[in-house]
């Protein structure tokens, strides 16, 4: 049975670059991998075909020979067929470690290697801390001292987990790699070592201070710089302030999630602040000045023109929130609400009634216009009927 063209197998053009070949191979290898298609002989055949095509075309000399002579270049007496060396095994390990997680399959043999560097090293876990601050603190910025429970390297054993005077020994099952491989036909299935649980080392005489864990629980005190202008939901990352790593692994990170308490006066939209201020009917009708609060703790005056209605908005420039890591500042918007007087005395009622009797449509243009439209609507409706 004749072999398919290698370029056709990978679905690339004959001018494909090395990176294009690699992308095509990764995609097809994941689709046809036997772990994703258990018991599917056709998938296994296609997977082998994809491997063979890539091994040829990814090698400069073999690709040149293939481009010139085709499959005949690798027949008996030719340049030699595509093989599966250690470099390919490492490349496949990288692919399937990302895709399949702890249990992976890769062509070829060889011992496994930890992703984080030397075998057995384990990165510390990331930590999360929720911090609630006031809007005033978000405006000015602050330094907050927090206390967090975490795990740190055991000082007694320096994080090795072994008792003083002893040290961990290399795992005899995996040879210190933390993983073992079992050959299954064409493939080698790689899994975490059952003896050392991926550490690559075995502690025979554990440290009494940490019970062999290499870490102990402690509470740490940290200072967090909260910059001015932070918004609700912002995340601050403190690199290396998470849990300590295991057996020389790097520490995790600390993520501080900010939330801002609701404010009694201000609502926030980005860098702008909004404040609803009640004004008297007289001030709204005759004009006047009102005093309004500012987020920095000061106050400012706002001139209310005669005839101001509920919902009228006044803008005060640069009295809002600072923009994070910028010199820009938002604005403060004052929205007035005309308050209708309550609990009137007899004399106050009489004065309002006198005003109402003397008022004309010019004094209430919106009301007059609205009811005029309503009247016209019903009159025209009756005419159509």
UniProtKB/Swiss-Prot annotation:
One of its GO terms (molecular function) is heat shock protein binding. GO terms for cellular component: cytoplasm. Zn(2+) 2 binds at residues 171, 174, 193, 196. A zinc finger (CR-type) spans 141-219. Residues 5-70 form the J domain. InterPro entries: DnaJ (IPR012724), DnaJ_C (IPR002939), DnaJ_domain (IPR001623), DnaJ_domain_CS (IPR018253), HSP40/DnaJ_pept-bd (IPR008971), HSP_DnaJ_Cys-rich_dom (IPR001305), HSP_DnaJ_Cys-rich_dom_sf (IPR036410), J_dom_sf (IPR036869). It holds the Pfam family DnaJ_CXXCXGXG. PROSITE patterns: DNAJ_1, DNAJ_2, ZF_CR. Keywords: Chaperone, Cytoplasm, DNA replication, Metal-binding, Repeat, Stress response, Zinc, Zinc-finger. CXXCXGXG motif repeats lie at residues 154-161, 171-178, 193-200, 207-214. Zn(2+) 1 binds at residues 154, 157, 207, 210. Its cofactor is Zn(2+). GO terms for biological process: chaperone cofactor-dependent protein refolding; DNA replication; protein refolding; response to heat. It is found in: Cytoplasm. Binds 2 Zn(2+) ions per monomer. It comes from the Bacteria. The keyword Transmembrane does not apply. CDD domains: DnaJ, DnaJ_C, DnaJ_zf. Belongs to the DnaJ family. Homodimer. The J domain is necessary and sufficient to stimulate DnaK ATPase activity. Zinc center 1 plays an important role in the autonomous, DnaK-independent chaperone activity of DnaJ. Zinc center 2 is essential for interaction with DnaK and for DnaJ activity. Participates actively in the response to hyperosmotic and heat shock by preventing the aggregation of stress-denatured proteins and by disaggregating proteins, also in an autonomous, DnaK-independent fashion. Unfolded proteins bind initially to DnaJ; upon interaction with the DnaJ-bound protein, DnaK hydrolyzes its bound ATP, resulting in the formation of a stable complex. GrpE releases ADP from DnaK; ATP binding to DnaK triggers the release of the substrate protein, thus completing the reaction cycle. This is Chaperone protein DnaJ. It comes from Methylorubrum extorquens (strain CM4 / NCIMB 13688).
């Amino acid at each position: 049975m004749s072999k398919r063209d290698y370029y056709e197998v990978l679905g690339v053009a004959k001018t494909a670059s090395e990176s294009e070949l690699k992308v095509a191979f990764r995609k097809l290898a994941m689709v046809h991998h036997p772990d994703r298609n258990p018991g599917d002989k056709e998938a296994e055949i296609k997977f082998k075909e994809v491997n063979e095509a890539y091994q040829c075309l990814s090698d400069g000399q073999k690709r040149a020979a293939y481009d010139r002579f085709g499959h005949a270049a690798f027949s008996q007496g030719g340049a030699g067929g595509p093989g599966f060396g250690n470099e390919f095994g490492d490349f496949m390990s990288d692919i399937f470690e990302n895709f399949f997680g702890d249990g992976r399959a890769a062509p070829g043999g060889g011992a496994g290697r930890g992703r984080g560097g030397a075998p057995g090293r384990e990165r510390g876990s990331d930590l999360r801390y929720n911090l609630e601050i006031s809007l005033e603190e978000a405006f000015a910025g602050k330094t907050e001292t927090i206390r967090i429970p975490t795990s740190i390297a055991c000082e007694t054993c320096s994080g090795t987990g072994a008792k003083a005077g002893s040290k961990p020994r290399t795992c005899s099952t995996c040879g210190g790699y933390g993983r073992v491989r079992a050959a299954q036909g064409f493939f080698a299935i790689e899994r975490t070592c059952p003896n050392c649980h991926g550490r690559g080392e075995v502690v025979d005489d554990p440290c009494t201070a940490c019970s062999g864990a290499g870490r102990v629980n402690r509470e740490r005190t940290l200072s967090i710089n909260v910059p001015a202008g932070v918004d609700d939901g912002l995340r601050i990352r403190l690199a290396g302030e998470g849990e300590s790593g295991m057996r020389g692994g790097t520490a995790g990170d600390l993520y501080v999630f900010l939330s801002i308490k609701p404010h009694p006066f201000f609502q926030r939209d980005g860098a702008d602040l909004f404040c609803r201020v009640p004004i008297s009917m007289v001030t709204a009708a005759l004009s006047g000045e009102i005093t309004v609060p500012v987020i920095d703790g000061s106050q400012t005056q706002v001139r209310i023109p005669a005839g101001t209605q509920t919902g009228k908005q006044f803008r005060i420039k640069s009295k809002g929130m600072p923009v994070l890591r910028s010199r820009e500042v938002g604005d403060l918007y004052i929205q007035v609400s005309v308050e209708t007087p309550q609990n009137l005395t007899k004399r106050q009622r009489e004065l309002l009634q006198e005003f109402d009797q003397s008022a004309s449509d010019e004094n209430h243009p919106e009301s007059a216009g609205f009811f005029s439209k309503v009247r016209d609507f019903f009159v025209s409706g009756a005419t159509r009927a």
